[in-house]
Curated annotation (Swiss-Prot):
Transmembrane stretches, start-end: 45-65
Misc. remarks from the entry: Present with 846 molecules/cell in log phase SD medium.
Source organism per UniProt: Saccharomyces cerevisiae (strain ATCC 204508 / S288c) (Baker's yeast)
Protein name as it appears in the record: Protein YSY6
Name of the gene encoding the protein in the UniProt record: YSY6
A biological process from GO: protein secretion
Coiled coil: none
GO CC term (a single one): endoplasmic reticulum
C-alpha cells in the first residue's frame, strides 16, 4: 500500500466516519418488513370456497326435496 500524506489520511478518516455513521454495514433496515405471499391466491381460495359451500347447499336442497 502506498504511503499517505497527512491530508489524505484526514480525508480518508472523514470519509470513513461518514460511511460508518450513515451506511451501517451489515445491518438490516428496521423500517421495512418483508411481506410473505400467501400460499394460495385469493382467487383460488374463492373458487374452492364456492365449490365447497355450493356443494353443501345442493346436498341440503336434494335432501329436503
Amino acid at each position: 500500500m502506498a504511503v499517505q500524506t497527512p491530508r489524505q489520511r484526514l480525508a480518508n478518516a472523514k470519509f470513513n466516519k461518514n460511511n460508518e455513521k450513515y451506511r451501517k454495514y451489515g445491518k438490516k433496515k428496521e423500517g421495512k418488513t418483508e411481506k410473505t405471499a400467501p400460499v394460495i391466491s385469493k382467487t383460488w381460495l374463492g373458487i374452492l370456497l364456492f365449490l365447497l359451500v355450493g356443494g353443501g347447499v345442493l346436498q341440503l336442497i336434494s335432501y329436503i326435496l
